[in-house]
């Protein structure tokens, strides 16, 4: 990515993917140095970050998408998430992105019935314990919601994807104050 001219990369460490599986006692039943307590379970992502940082130098952006709320049985506690967030920061992560829930979680996280910015308190709690910027995601689909998260210091940045699929002119309309013209993402999670 660096050789191709990118400013940074994001490491997917949430939603139940491989790195998240090492982090969570939900599936990590290992009894070696890669399993057990959180210090061992976080070894895999921390080593990944350290290796990337060593290759790309200090100025290259490394964003880590961390599962801040697993929503599965035996998922990480908030205390464990904070320990991991601090360790990732120390290992060289530039930004922390928000992952909420595993794909197989029975609790909805992005559908219409979930209130906008429903997980802001979880994000803000992690933000209180690190010095690197924390990105809010999940059910942030209108400019007012994003601005509120930033104004209330619950996040440093806001990430969106589905809202831009619903309206490719979202940013232009928001910047012109035409939020009433935005084709709002309704969180149907279909074809996106």
Question: Model-predicted segments: where are they?
Answer:
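Flavin-dependent oxidoreductase catalytic cores
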Residues: 2-192
